[in-house]
C-alpha cells in the first residue's frame, strides 16, 4: 500500500491478507496501534519498522548486502579482535544486515541467527536474507533460552535484539550475560547494540562489567545515537593498540569499512573509561 508517512511516494509492505482494509491498516500505522513489524520502501532503500518513530534496519536496494546503518558497521569492529571467528551467534535478525554481511564476507564462519518474532522471520525475503545452508541457520527461538541449552565454544556473540519498547526484556538481566560469558571460548567476545532511551539499558552496562571482570569497552555511534559495547571473555585481555592500527588498515582494504576510524573511537573510549562512566550515570 502507499506509504502514509511519505508525501513524496513510497510504499509499505505488511504481513496481511489481500482482502485486508487498506484504510484500517493506514489508520493503525499512523496511530501506532499496528502490532506487527512492517517494511517501508522508498524506491532506493528498504526499512524495517516496529513503529513509525524508529528504524530497526535499513537496506540500500542497489547494494543489499552492504551495511547501511552506522551502528551495524561498528558492530563489525569485533573483527579487530577476532578476525577469523569459527562460530558466530547473532541474537536478533531484524532486516538481516549483519547476517548478510557476515555470511558473504566470512564464508568460513558458521553462523546461527536467533529471532523470537516469527513475523520478523517472515520478512526475511523482503530483505534478501539468503536461505539456510551449511554455514547459516535462522531459527525462531528466545536468545536466553537458546544459550542455556547450546554448547560452549562461541567465538563471537552479537546481540542486536529489540522489540517495540526497546532492548529485548528477556535479555536485560544478569543471568543472560552470565550465560553468555559461560558459552564463549576463552578468547571469545560479546558485542551488544545499545539503543533507544538510555534509562532502558543504563543498568545493564554495570552488570556486564561485573560479569566480564571489567573487560568491557563501550563506544558511541553518534550518527545513530547508539552505543556499541564490547565485552571480552579473557580476564587479562589487554589490547595491543599499535598492532591493531596495522590490522585496521588491512581490514579496511578487505571489507570496505572504516576500521581505522572504529579503532580510534574504541581506543579513546577505552582510555577514557567510557563504560565505567556510563555505568555510574543517573538518568
Language-model features, listed with the residues they occupy:
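A short, flexible beta-alpha/helix-coil linker loop
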Residues: 53-57, 162-165, 190
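The AdoMet/dcAdoMet-binding core of the Class I SAM-like
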Residues: 3-4, 11, 28-30, 42, ...
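A generic structural signal for alpha->beta connector loops
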Residues: 108-110, 133-135, 187, 213-215, ...
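C-terminal substrate-binding/active-site "lid" region of AdoMet-derived donor-dependent transferases
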Residues: 175-239
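Short glycine-/acidic-enriched loop or helix-start segments at secondary-structure transitions
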Residues: 99-100, 168, 201-202, 240-241
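SAM/dcSAM-binding transferase cores
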Residues: 2-43, 47, 55-62, 227-283
